Amino acid sequence: MAITAQMVKELREKTGAGMMDCKKALTETNGDMEKAIDFLREKGIAKAAKKADRIAAEGLTFIETNGNDGLILELNSETDFVAKNEGFQTLIKELAAHLLANKPANVEEAMAQTMENGKKVEEHINEAIAKIGEKLTLRRFEIVSKTDADAFGAYLHMGGRIGVLTVLEGSTDEAAAKDVAMHIAAVNPKYIDRDAVTAEEVEHERQVLTQQALNEGKPEKIVAKMVEGRLGKFFEEICLLDQAFVKNPDMKVRQFVESKGGTLKGFVRYAVGEGIEKREDNFAEEVMNQVKGSN
C-alpha cells in the first residue's frame, strides 16, 4: 500500500512521533493506522494515543437542568465568530429548553417535533440559518435524570467549547458535582472506573506493554510484573475515579466523591467538533478553482 504524506501527517498528530518514524511504522504495518500506533508504542517512540481526533468544527455545547432532568447538547456552526452571535446563543437556549421538555429519543426525532411557536425544530433552525448566514447543525444531545437525593454537576469550559454534566448519587452537593465536572473537562477520562473498561481493551494494552518491555531488553521473568505496574498507570489515565483530583492532587477523585457521601452515577463530556474534521482543500486546486470560476 502506498504511504501518503497525509497518512504520515495524521500519524504524527496522533502520536507526536517524528516524520521518518511515522513513515517507517506505516510501511511496516501496510498503512494500518491503529497497528502503526501500536508499532510506535512498542518501540517506545510514542506515548499511548489519546485517539481524540482533531477538533475542527465550531459551535458551542450547552447544559440545561430542570428539577431531576438534565440535558447537554452540541450545536455546530461554520465559524467561531457565529458561535458568539446573539442569535446563535438564543437558538441554543431555545433548543435546550425544548429538548429537555419533550425528551426526543434522537436528533432525527427532535427535528420533526413542533416547538411552542408552532414551527418544527428543523424549520426553526433553518430560519436561524437564513438570518445568521451560516449552516447550523444540531449535532447531538443527551438527557440524564436523577432523584431528589442526587445532584447535577454542570460545567461549561471556555464559554461552551467543552461541556460536562455529571450525576452525583446519594449526595445533594452541587458544588462537589461541579468540581468533578471541571476535572472531567480538564483530564478527559474515558470511563468512570476499571469495571467499565472492556476485557479486550485491557488485553490489547497488556500485549502492547509486554512487547514494549521486551523491546527494552528487560528479562522475561520481570516483564509480567513491569506490565502490571504500567497497566495501573494506564487505568489512571483513562478511569476517572483512579485519577488524581485536579483541585487536590493528593487525593484520588474516588476519595473526593466518597468524602462528600456520594458515588458518581455517570457523566457526559462533549467537546465541540470532536470527531469532525474540516475538509482541507489542496491550495493549488483552490487557486485553480478560483481561476476557472472567474472565466
UniProtKB/Swiss-Prot annotation:
Keywords: Cytoplasm, Elongation factor, Protein biosynthesis. GO terms for cellular component: cytoplasm. Gene3D superfamilies: 1.10.286.20, DNA helicase RuvA subunit, C-terminal domain (1.10.8.10), Elongation factor Ts, dimerisation domain (3.30.479.20). Residues 79-82 are annotated as: Involved in Mg(2+) ion dislocation from EF-Tu. InterPro entries: EF-Ts_dimer_sf, Transl_elong_EFTs/EF1B, Transl_elong_EFTs/EF1B_dimer, Transl_elong_Ts_CS, UBA-like_sf. NCBIfam families: tsf. Belongs to the EF-Ts family. This is Elongation factor Ts. It comes from Bacillus anthracis.
